[in-house]
Amino acid sequence: MAKSRPHIILSAAVSIDGKIATHLGESNLSSKMDLIRLHQLRRVVDAILVGKNTINVDDPLLTVRHAKGKNPIRIILDSSGTISANSKIVKTANKISTILVVAERAPRNISKLGKKGVEIIRCGRDKIDLKKLLNILQKRGISKILLEGGGITNWYFLKEKLVDELILTVTPYILGSKDAISLVQGEGFGKISKSPSFKLKKIERMKNEIVLYYAS
C-alpha cells in the first residue's frame, strides 16, 4: 500500500555534543565536503522544508549551489505568518518555487507575500497540521522532502513519527551551553520506550567528520 505522505529525510550537521547551533545562533558546522554532500542530496528531493526560526536566524537561500542540479521547492512552516519580507527566501520566491505554510489564525495581510511570488497554504486551525499538510503535498506530486530543521521543527516531525530517514554529520566541535540549539528541541520524550527508534544503515567518514545514515 502506497504511503499517503511524502518520504521524509531529516538531515543535519551536529557537534560532538549533539548541538546544531551555538547559544548565539551560529550554525555553520559543516565542512566544504559536507556541504557538497548536502547539496547533492538537495538536488534529488522534491522539496526542502524548514521552520521559521531557521529563516529568521540563518536567512538561508535553501538552493543547490555546491553541486549541479535543479533547485527543489522551498517550504517554510510559520504558524503565525511572521516571516520577514526581506528574507532571502522571500526575495527569491519569484525565481524559485516557495511555499509558506501557516495556520488558519494567521493574519490575512500575509497575502502580500503572494505578490512577491510566495504561495501560501493554510493548514490547521491554531497550529499547522503536519499530517494534513503532507497529504496535500503528496497530492501535488511532492514525494520526497528534505527536512533541514531547526530543532523545534525536527521535534514536531519526530513526535508525529513522520521521519523515514535520518542523516547526521557529526562534526569535530563541542559547543556546550544549555541554551545552544539541540538537534531536537521541544518538550522531548519522557520515556525511552515512547521515543522513535532508528536503524543504523551506513557510516561514512569524511576526514574529520562522520556521516551516520539511519532509517526508521
Predicted regions and their residues:
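Enzymes that bind and transform nitrogen-containing heteroaromatic metabolites
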Residues: 1-216
